[in-house]
Curated annotation (Swiss-Prot):
CDD domains: YdjC_EF3048_like. InterPro entries: COD_ChbG_bac (IPR022948), Glyco_hydro/deAcase_b/a-brl (IPR011330), YdjC-like (IPR006879). This is Carbohydrate deacetylase. It is an enzyme of class 3 (hydrolase). It comes from Listeria welshimeri serovar 6b (strain ATCC 35897 / DSM 20650 / CCUG 15529 / CIP 8149 / NCTC 11857 / SLCC 5334 / V8). GO terms for biological process: polysaccharide catabolic process.
Length: 245
């Protein structure tokens, strides 16, 4: 089997940037996805350019912060900010202009490309793929990238994806044992499994803007541990990135 440890939320805070960098340089993370509207976007771009082996994707969002474009009336609240989570977006989906969705996601992609980075894959913040999949599919074809294989989406066409997407390494599931269970479920197969991760060093920015905070430093510890790397080697698990699909 092969595993992609993808680090979501690149750029959400300086601590997240450096936590992901640590998990790449000393650990098993080879891919990360960048929030184009994030507070530490410029720092993330700088770090990405200094570490060209780190595979960069776009962490497309309609549920974090503010959009890059103005005038998106069906995607924002009275303060001009996105809805705060999947449920809020889903509940208002009937009123959402999908043209606005496509324009905003395109702007996010173009901002990352315009910063001089190459994108290999797309995923979404708060796993909103099922709500916007036709547009994500269209943009993935347009830009020639891979996408995350969300369980609630079945028709990927010619777009490359991992075979499976594992979300168990999150919150109370952040443990070495969780990764071992994932490996044991697929060992001896040709499956390519993406494991979602959110490593970060905790800082005030992260505390102010994210509800998922404390487990992130534990993720860094596990993803950089010699124990994990030795285990993956013993099980002959190949750690790859989205570039390798």
């Amino acid at each position: 089997m092969k595993i992609i440890f993808n680090a979501d939320d690149f750029g959400i805070s300086p601590g997240a940037v450096y936590g992901i960098l640590e998990s790449y340089k000393k650990g098993v993370v080879k891919s990360t996805t960048l929030l184009a509207n994030s507070p530490a976007f410029d720092l993330a771009v700088e770090v990405a350019k200094e570490n060209p082996g780190l595979d960069i994707g776009a962490h497309l969002t309609l549920t974090f912060g503010s959009p890059l474009l103005q005038g998106l009336e069906t995607l924002t609240d009275d303060d001009g900010r996105f809805r705060k989570n999947y449920t809020a977006l889903e509940n208002g989906l009937a009123d959402v202009d999908m043209g606005e969705v496509e324009r905003e996601l395109t702007a996010q992609i173009k901002k990352i490309l315009g910063a001089g980075l190459t994108i290999s894959h797309f995923d979404t913040h708060h796993s909103i793929e099922p709500l916007i999949y036709p547009i994500q599919h269209k943009l993935a074809e347009k830009y020639g990238v891979s996408i995350r294989r969300h369980a609630d989406v079945s028709d990927f066409g010619a777009i490359k994806t991992p075979d499976l997407f594992e979300t168990a390494f999150y919150a109370d599931g952040v443990s070495f044992e969780t990764i071992k269970k994932i490996v044991q479920a697929h060992i001896g197969t040709n499956d390519v499994v993406e494991v979602m991760t959110h490593p970060a060093f905790i800082d005030e920015t992260l505390r102010e803007i994210s509800s998922y905070v404390e487990p992130r430093i534990k993720e860094v510890s596990i993803l950089t541990s010699r124990e994990l790397q030795a285990y993956l080697g013993q099980q002959e698990v190949e750690v790859i990135s989205f570039r390798d699909l």
